[in-house]
Curated annotation (Swiss-Prot):
Protein name according to UniProt: Bifunctional purine biosynthesis protein PurH
One Gene Ontology term from the biological process aspect of the record: 'de novo' IMP biosynthetic process
UniProt cross-references to PANTHER family, sorted A to Z: BIFUNCTIONAL PURINE BIOSYNTHESIS PROTEIN ATIC, BIFUNCTIONAL PURINE BIOSYNTHESIS PROTEIN PURH
Pathway in which the depicted protein is active: Purine metabolism; IMP biosynthesis via de novo pathway; 5-formamido-1-(5-phospho-D-ribosyl)imidazole-4-carboxamide from 5-amino-1-(5-phospho-D-ribosyl)imidazole-4-carboxamide (10-formyl THF route): step 1/1; Purine metabolism; IMP biosynthesis via de novo pathway; IMP from 5-formamido-1-(5-phospho-D-ribosyl)imidazole-4-carboxamide: step 1/1
Assigned protein family: Belongs to the PurH family.
């Protein structure tokens, strides 16, 4: 008796060649709907599923494979006499190979499918056959990925059957595949049919392997890079690398942080970042000048940094950047001449990202792993209106200081807490990240600012990601000659801080919104 294969695929890639090969190896093929039409067109002998079940396909194909003569053929254990006896009694012939891929739910979602279209792309019979076959992998070979066709054919050609170890690998892949498929459906329906003020009791997320990595944060750690099942266009995961060696774990983390900063700026802007903190941000009327400002902000720390530009890289900008060692440059595009200049540096990584999709949604989830669990929050992308800010001091900020505050407030959001930043209206001057007390961060930012020219420091302001708990911060700020501060406010000692600012003639604005970053 010939061995039987059941083939039912949405993705027809490679299926004709595969079917021809297994026919030549003596296999009988059972097929469904569209798959049968393709095989018939190529004159590959096959049997329609309804010839096996004696039951017609119906309900626009919703019901065709959910039948005991199919699932019994997949689930029956060949090593159990009771199973084989039941199969004989009910005229169930074994199926030894299942080749199934599922309705294109993800592809339809990404194409903007309507709710009705999405519902019709929820595959029922396909996952059921895959799961039945995978459960019985001791006897059944199950294939859900066209990339595995060649491996299956090789084993069948050489050995006449597949090895148990290979069937085990394929079965595990099937359950990963169906779990991912169901996770996307659950994610879609949860967003489509939300329950107000009720959190989902289960969190189902799915990610696809984008890149294996040589190591993680340190050489002794293993790491891989996975991309969200529903891709985010403006992301390091969707970037296109056009030059240089592969990204490392730390490269990906830093590039992600730099991209998050860049999307908050509309003007031509350059962001320089090291170890998850900005070391230079510059905005100007053109991208070359923006680079000058970002570089001038901290010409020491920028060495070996990550650079994001929100405009095309020009030849002049590329020539300037090529003079120092940089790990990564990310931009919407590169002029031909700029690419020629930068490509001469073998180790630099050049990437492009679609900046037209940079706007973030507050619904966009930010997932952070902790021991034994996950923390999930929405992105800190709330749109703020400076007109709603409150001047807390007697001294009013000048128009120039207000412009600098707007710039500082955008930038400090991305400094690790306790985060302090000193800026003028177009570039960062000093960054004080990640200290366990706020006055420590203030001192670091002011020290970095002190070596800048008087011209650059004119109209400089200081931004703080959270409130000042004590007035000692203001004492340090006043010593440095800073005359304007932007911070959220909200401390029980706000009045002490306000009084200190009034004492020193410093203007201070409360935004009412904190921006911790851990």
């Amino acid at each position: 008796m010939s061995k039987r294969a059941l083939i039912s695929v949405s993705d027809k890639e490679g299926i004709v060649e595969f079917a021809k090969e297994i026919r030549e190896l003596g296999w009988e093929i059972i097929s469904t709907g569209g798959t049968k039409a393709v095989l018939d067109q190529e004159e590959i002998p096959n049997i329609a599923i309804d010839e096996v079940t004696g039951f017609p396909e119906m309900m626009d194909g919703r019901l065709k494979t959910l039948h005991p003569l199919i699932h019994g053929a997949l689930l029956g254990r060949r090593d159990l006499e009771s199973h084989m006896k039941s199969m004989t009694e009910h005229h169930i012939s074994p199926i030894d190979l299942v080749v199934v891929n599922l309705y294109p739910f993800k592809e339809t979602l990404l194409a903007g499918g309507s709710q009705a279209e999405m519902i019709e792309k929820i595959d029922i019979g396909g996952p059921s056959m895959l799961r039945s076959a995978a459960k019985n992998h001791a006897s059944v070979t199950v294939v859900c990925d066209p990339n595995d066709y060649e491996k299956v054919l090789t084993e069948l050609s050489v050995k006449g059957e597949t090895s148990l170890s290979f069937r085990q690998q394929l079965a595990a892949k099937v359950f990963r595949h169906t779990a991912s498929y169901d996770a996307l459906i659950a994610q879609y329906l949860t967003e489509e049919f939300p329950v107000e003020n009720v959190k989902p009791e289960k969190l189902t997320l799915t990610y696809d392997l984008k890149q294996g990595m040589r190591y993680g944060e340190n050489p002794q750690q293993n790491a891989d890079f996975y991309e969200s099942g529903i891709p985010t266009t403006y992301s390091i995961a969707q970037s296109k690398q056009i030059h240089g060696k592969e990204l490392s774990y730390n490269n990906v983390r830093d590039a992600d942080a730099a991209l998050q900063i860049a999307r908050d700026f509309e003007e031509p802007t350059v962001v320089a970042l090291k170890h998850m903190n900005p070391c230079g941000i510059g905005t100007a009327t053109d991208i070359e000048k923006a680079w000058d400002y970002a570089y001038e902000a901290d010409p020491v720390s920028i060495f070996g940094g990550i650079i994001v530009l929100n405009r095309e890289v020009t030849l002049a900008t590329a020539q300037k950047m090529s003079k120092i060692f940089l790990e990564i440059i990310i931009a919407p595009s590169y002029s031909k001449e700029a690419l020629e200049v930068l490509s001469k540096k073998k180790n630099i990584r050049l990437l492009t990202v679609d900046f037209s999709k940079k706007e973030a949604s507050e619904k966009e989830a930010l997932v952070t792993g902790v021991l034994g669990g996950l923390l999930v929050q929405n992105q800190d992308v709330i749109v703020e209106n400076p007109k709603e800010w409150t001047v807390a001091t007697k001294v009013q900020p000048t128009d120039r200081q207000m412009e600098a505050m707007k710039f500082a407030w955008k930038a400090v959001k991305f400094v690790k807490s306790n985060g302090i930043i000193v800026t003028n209206d177009h570039q960062t001057l000093g960054v004080g990240p990640g200290q366990t007390n706020r006055v420590g961060s203030v001192k670091i930012a002011l020290e970095a600012t002190a070596d800048k020219s008087v011209e650059l420091q004119e109209n400089a302001v200081l931004g703080s990601d959270a409130f000042f708990p004590f007035a000692d911060n203001i004492d340090e700020i006043a010593k440095a000659g800073i005359k304007a501060i932007v911070q959220p406010g909200g401390s029980v000692r706000d009045q002490e801080v306000i009084d200190a600012c009034d004492k020193y003639g410093i203007a201070m604005v409360f935004t009412g919104l904190r921006h911790f970053r851990h």
